[in-house]
Curated annotation (Swiss-Prot):
Transaldolase is important for the balance of metabolites in the pentose-phosphate pathway. It comes from Exiguobacterium sibiricum (strain DSM 17290 / CCUG 55495 / CIP 109462 / JCM 13490 / 255-15). GO terms for molecular function: aldehyde-lyase activity; transaldolase activity. It catalyses: D-sedoheptulose 7-phosphate + D-glyceraldehyde 3-phosphate = D-erythrose 4-phosphate + beta-D-fructose 6-phosphate. Its EC number is 2.2.1.2. PROSITE patterns: TRANSALDOLASE_1. The active site is at K84. Belongs to the transaldolase family. Type 3B subfamily. One of its GO terms (cellular component) is cytoplasm. This is Probable transaldolase. It is found in: Cytoplasm. Keywords: Cytoplasm, Pentose shunt, Schiff base, Transferase. GO terms for biological process: carbohydrate metabolic process; pentose-phosphate shunt. Pathway: Carbohydrate degradation; pentose phosphate pathway; D-glyceraldehyde 3-phosphate and beta-D-fructose 6-phosphate from D-ribose 5-phosphate and D-xylulose 5-phosphate (non-oxidative stage): step 2/3.
């Protein structure tokens, strides 16, 4: 399973990139709004940092014509831009049109298997089921990822699954087991993946033993 970072903060992206584990970036209007910067300018900054890995940038328009227009504009920013569109009939129309022009697409806000299947049929490069948001309303977010993965295997569908709305390390482990191709996660969760109390204790013990040996 590959790792994307879910943020528009360049410092967070730099930290993840330096770890050598970053396979892509996902952004959305809410994340960019938090940064208080020009959307296109920030996307260029991100692309410069991460090189040629996928950078998902979401359209704002709700109609198909507007999504297609915005998607083409976003794709001009850098060759590794993936156009992110919401799961709606208009979104499917936009995905179909953009895919015909070899523009990679990520259909977001997936909450059931049929949505993922339709997005894939329209030509989506990625689908993004939202785990945490389903868990918030008492539904099985991880079960959704597993079901989508099974359907894609049965029907030999090449669309990749991005586990989104990932809140904790357990989500990451379970997404990998469920068959997600990618997990997109914020920096705090990435950092928590590196941590375990016994790792910390082990480091402290090694250092203490080393200091004793030098006396």
């Amino acid at each position: 399973m590959r790792f994307f970072i879910d943020t528009a903060n360049v410092e967070d992206i730099k930290k993840a990139h330096k770890m050598g584990i970053l396979d892509g970036v996902t952004t959305n209007p809410s994340l960019v709004a938090k940064e208080g910067v020009d959307f296109h300018t920030r996307l260029r900054e991100i692309c410069e940092i991460v090189g040629d890995v996928s950078v998902s940038a979401e359209v704002i328009a709700l109609d198909a014509e507007g999504m297609i227009r915005e998607g083409k504009e976003l794709a001009q920013i850098a060759p590794n831009i993936t156009v992110k569109v919401p799961m709606t009939p208009a979104g499917l129309e936009a995905v179909a049109a953009l895919s015909k022009e070899n523009i990679t697409t990520n259909v977001t806000l997936i909450f059931n298997p049929n949505q993922a299947l339709l997005a894939a049929r329209a030509g989506a490069t990625y689908v993004s089921p939202f785990l945490g948001r389903l868990d918030d309303i008492g539904q099985d977010g991880m079960g959704l990822v597993e079901t989508i993965a099974q359907i894609f295997v049965i029907h030999d569908i090449p669309t990749q699954i991005i586990a989104a709305s990932v809140r904790n390390p357990v989500h990451v482990t379970n997404a990998a087991l469920a068959g997600a191709d990618i997990a997109t996660i914020p920096l705090n969760v990435i950092e928590s993946l590196t941590q375990h109390p016994l790792t910390t204790q082990g480091i402290e013990r090694f250092l203490a033993d080393w200091e004793k040996a030098q006396q």
